[in-house]
Amino acid sequence: MTCTIVVGGQWGDEGKGKIISYLCKKDNPSIIARGGVGPNAGHTVEVDGEKYGIRMVPTGFPNVNAKLAVGAGVLTDPEVLLKEIQMLEKFNVGERMLVDYRCGIIEETHKELDKSNEHLSKEIGSTGTGCGPANVDRAMRTLKQGKDIESISKYMGDVSKAVNEALEAGDNVLIEGTQGSLLSLFYGSYPYVTSKDTNAASFAADVGVGPTKIDEVVAVFKSYPTRVGEGPFPTEMSVEEAESLGVVEYGTVTGRRRRVGYFDHELAKKVCRLNGATQIAITCLDKYDTECYGITEYEKLSEKGKAFIKEVEEKVGVKVTLISTGPELGQTIDVRK
């Protein structure tokens, strides 16, 4: 029995979707539970060459044997949830979906307010998905809950009960975090942050799991960090430099171009300390050095690639156990014992 939490180590867009999908296939958890803010964070999962952009359904959906759960702490947009369930019909997502009846519900008014608020949309760079305004209503105790919405009633249940019973039965459980630690309302670059905490302890609380039940915390870092929206970015490079390196990306939810920077070891160390990370996953090593593309054995990495991994381990103080060398699940180096 292992309960693992996957967290983003930067400003989101670290490639958590790929790492989560890999862990779900390799470790075969019986439940994949999603924590985090809500549909403001997008994950891209590639299965057999086909890409799926999702915001509500857990990214471990390719594991067709696992139950998929959305915790009570996660804001839910019924429209987005139902569209994704339909889009992923061939993975039998609808039959495996469990949404906590206590989850907060995003309504159209929340999205309208998010988009029309100049401070949120222009100064902060909100995604406009209604999460901030919905969390305001939640704090005021006026927000609707999942149990109040007829259109998603068939998916309602007690996620905390299901997850804890799975752990008691000796099953593996994976908890998905969203966004990134540096976007935390408490520990990020305030006010350029999201509307709640985005660290491991909060993700555990989102799905109703106590801290003593957590065995592993995997912090995911991209070889070159990216950020969408406003806010400090200490190692940011120019657009021209990013283009010369072939690093041009756009946000899954917003479609906005991502800002690009160099790996920041000090920030990574801070994030690992904050989350109690037990291991690190590095993604896009093939973008840092194209010679690493598709490599599946550590010994076969280029010297440049190995040096990057070694420097991360030495300066951050946490073992790198997973290395992504391409978009496909099989393009992964796994050095876990």
From Swiss-Prot:
<keyword id="KW-0460">Magnesium</keyword>
<feature type="binding site" description="in other chain">
    <location>
        <position position="127"/>
    </location>
    <ligand>
        <name>IMP</name>
    </ligand>
</feature>
<feature type="binding site" description="in other chain">
    <location>
        <position position="194"/>
    </location>
    <ligand>
        <name>IMP</name>
    </ligand>
</feature>
<feature type="binding site">
    <location>
        <position position="141"/>
    </location>
    <ligand>
        <name>IMP</name>
    </ligand>
</feature>
<feature type="binding site">
    <location>
        <begin position="42"/>
        <end position="44"/>
    </location>
    <ligand>
        <name>GTP</name>
    </ligand>
</feature>
<keyword id="KW-0479">Metal-binding</keyword>
<dbReference type="GO" id="GO:0046040">
    <property type="term" value="P:IMP metabolic process"/>
</dbReference>
<dbReference type="GO" id="GO:0005525">
    <property type="term" value="F:GTP binding"/>
</dbReference>
<keyword id="KW-0658">Purine biosynthesis</keyword>
<dbReference type="GO" id="GO:0000287">
    <property type="term" value="F:magnesium ion binding"/>
</dbReference>
<feature type="binding site" description="in other chain">
    <location>
        <begin position="40"/>
        <end position="43"/>
    </location>
    <ligand>
        <name>IMP</name>
    </ligand>
</feature>
<feature type="binding site">
    <location>
        <begin position="284"/>
        <end position="286"/>
    </location>
    <ligand>
        <name>GTP</name>
    </ligand>
</feature>
<dbReference type="InterPro" id="IPR018220">
    <property type="entry name" value="Adenylosuccin_syn_GTP-bd"/>
</dbReference>
<feature type="binding site">
    <location>
        <begin position="252"/>
        <end position="258"/>
    </location>
    <ligand>
        <name>substrate</name>
    </ligand>
</feature>
<dbReference type="GO" id="GO:0004019">
    <property type="term" value="F:adenylosuccinate synthase activity"/>
</dbReference>
<comment type="subunit">
    <text>Homodimer.</text>
</comment>
<dbReference type="InterPro" id="IPR042109">
    <property type="entry name" value="Adenylosuccinate_synth_dom1"/>
</dbReference>
<keyword id="KW-0547">Nucleotide-binding</keyword>
<feature type="binding site">
    <location>
        <position position="13"/>
    </location>
    <ligand>
        <name>Mg(2+)</name>
    </ligand>
</feature>
<feature type="binding site">
    <location>
        <position position="258"/>
    </location>
    <ligand>
        <name>GTP</name>
    </ligand>
</feature>
<feature type="binding site" description="in other chain">
    <location>
        <begin position="13"/>
        <end position="16"/>
    </location>
    <ligand>
        <name>IMP</name>
    </ligand>
</feature>
<comment type="similarity">
    <text>Belongs to the adenylosuccinate synthetase family.</text>
</comment>
<keyword id="KW-0436">Ligase</keyword>
<keyword id="KW-0342">GTP-binding</keyword>
<dbReference type="GO" id="GO:0044208">
    <property type="term" value="P:'de novo' AMP biosynthetic process"/>
</dbReference>
<comment type="pathway">
    <text>Purine metabolism; AMP biosynthesis via de novo pathway; AMP from IMP: step 1/2.</text>
</comment>
<dbReference type="GO" id="GO:0005737">
    <property type="term" value="C:cytoplasm"/>
</dbReference>
<comment type="function">
    <text>Plays an important role in the de novo pathway of purine nucleotide biosynthesis. Catalyzes the first committed step in the biosynthesis of AMP from IMP.</text>
</comment>
<feature type="active site" description="Proton acceptor">
    <location>
        <position position="13"/>
    </location>
</feature>
<dbReference type="InterPro" id="IPR027417">
    <property type="entry name" value="P-loop_NTPase"/>
</dbReference>
<dbReference type="InterPro" id="IPR001114">
    <property type="entry name" value="Adenylosuccinate_synthetase"/>
</dbReference>
<feature type="binding site">
    <location>
        <position position="42"/>
    </location>
    <ligand>
        <name>Mg(2+)</name>
    </ligand>
</feature>
<feature type="binding site">
    <location>
        <begin position="12"/>
        <end position="18"/>
    </location>
    <ligand>
        <name>GTP</name>
    </ligand>
</feature>
<keyword id="KW-0963">Cytoplasm</keyword>
<dbReference type="InterPro" id="IPR042111">
    <property type="entry name" value="Adenylosuccinate_synth_dom3"/>
</dbReference>
<feature type="binding site" description="in other chain">
    <location>
        <position position="179"/>
    </location>
    <ligand>
        <name>IMP</name>
    </ligand>
</feature>
<feature type="binding site" description="in other chain">
    <location>
        <position position="256"/>
    </location>
    <ligand>
        <name>IMP</name>
    </ligand>
</feature>
<protein>
    <recommendedName>
        <fullName>Adenylosuccinate synthetase</fullName>
        <ecNumber>6.3.4.4</ecNumber>
    </recommendedName>
</protein>
<feature type="active site" description="Proton donor">
    <location>
        <position position="43"/>
    </location>
</feature>
<dbReference type="Pfam" id="PF00709">
    <property type="entry name" value="Adenylsucc_synt"/>
</dbReference>
<feature type="binding site">
    <location>
        <begin position="324"/>
        <end position="326"/>
    </location>
    <ligand>
        <name>GTP</name>
    </ligand>
</feature>
